[in-house]
Amino acid sequence: MSYRPGSYSVSSMRPVGSVRSSQVMTVQRSMPLASAASVYGGAGGRGSRISVGGSSSGFGSGLGSGAGGSYSSMSVSGSGLVGNEKETMIGLNDRLAAYLETVRNLEQANSKLEFQIREALEKKGPTTRDLSPFEKTLEDLRKKVYDMTMDNSRLVLQIDNSRLAADDFRVKFESEYSIRQSVESDIIGLRKVIDDTNMGRMNLESEIESLKEELIFIKQNHNQEVNDLRNQIAQSGVQVDVDAPKGQDLAQVLAEVRAQYESMAQKNRDELKAWHENKLTEVEVEVIQNTEALQGARTEVTELRRQMQSLEIELESQRSMKASLEDSLRDTEMRNNMEMERYNNMILQLEAELGQLRGNIQMQASEYEALLNIKMKLEAEIATYRRLLDGEDFRLQDALVDQSSTKSIKKVTVTQTLVDGKVVSESTNTKEIGK
C-alpha cells in the first residue's frame, strides 16, 4: 500500500475503569499534496512519529514502558533518507523486540502476582473465615447458661412453694394455738368449777358433821331429860290415877320424833350424797374430756411445731442452696463474659487481619489492573506498529514524490474497535477537501 505526500495520524482511545474493557482506535488520514508527510502512532502518550519535510525529513520514535516512558528522535536529510531506511527499520524492529520482551516480562509478573494472590487466599482465607470452633464453644456456653438459668428458676419455684407451705402451716399453727388457748381457758374455768364443787362438798360435809353432832347432842339431852324425869318420878313415890283417858307414852313420842329426825337426816344425807356423786361424776367426765382434748391439742401443737421446724430447716437449706447457685451463676456469667470478650477480641483481630488481607489483595489487584492496562496499551502500540509496518504496506519512498502536485486535501477517517488487542470492527470515512 502506498501513501501520497500528506499527513497520517493514528490515535488510540481507551476508557479507564475496567480491565477487560474494549479499546477504540481512530485512524485519521489527511493528505495534502503539497504538505509534508507525517506518521504518528501511539497509545496513551507513548508511540512513534515519522515526519518528512520538503528539504529535510525527521524520523523519531518514542517508547514508553510503565507510567512515563522514553522518547528518542532521529532526523535525516532528504537525500540520505533512502539510504538510512534499512537502519530505521532495524531500529524499529529492535524497539518492537524490546516491546515484546517487556510484554513477556509483564505477563510473567502477572502470572507470579496471580500465583501469590491464590497462595495468600489459600493460606489466610479459610482460617479467617473458619469460625465454627468458636461458634460451637459459644453454643455450649449458651446452653450451660440456659440450663443454669432453668435450674435457678426451678429452685426459686421450689422455694416459693416451700414458703407458701410454711405460710399455710403458720396459719394452721396460729388457728390451733388459738384453739389451744380457748381450751386452756375452758380448763381453767372447769378447774374453778371443780374447786367450787369441792368447796360446796366440803361445806355440805361440814354441815353433815355439824348436824350429826347436833343430833347426838339432842339425843344426849333427850336421854338426860328422860332419865331425870324417871328419877323424879321414882323418888316421889306418888301415884296419881286420873280418870281421863290414858295419854300417849312420852318415850314413844320421843322415839317417833327421833325416828322422824333420823329418817329426815338420812334422807338429806342420801340426797346430798347422790347429788354430790352425780355432780362429781359429771365434773370428772368433763375433766376427762377436756384433758383428752388438751392432750390432743398438745400433741397436734407439738407435731405442728416439729413440722414448722423441719420446714424452717428446709427453707434455710433452700436459701443457702439458692445463694450458692446465685454465686455460681454470677461466677459462670463472669467467666462467660470474659470468654466472650476474649472471643470478641479474637474475632476483631481476625476481622482486622481479614481487612488488611483484603486491602493487600485490593492493592495487588490495583497493581495487577495497572499492569494489565500497561500490557493492553503496549499491545495496542504493538498492533499499531504491526499495522503501520505490515498491514498498511507503508513505504518511505512515497514520501519523496514531487511536492508540486495538485494541492488537495483528502481526509480519511478509519475507526477500529479493539478488544484485548484484537480488531473487532473497522469503519472508514473518506472526505476530500479542495484548497
Curated annotation (Swiss-Prot):
Domain IF rod, chain residue ranges per copy: 85-396
Family, per entry: Belongs to the intermediate filament family.
Annotated region described as Tail, given as residue ranges: 392-435
Subunit structure: Heterotetramer of two type I and two type II keratins. Keratin-18 associates with keratin-8.
Region called Linker 12, residue ranges: 230-253
Organism (species): Acipenser baerii
Linker 1: annotated span: 121-137
Protein name, entry field: Keratin, type I cytoskeletal 18
Post-translational modification: Phosphorylated.
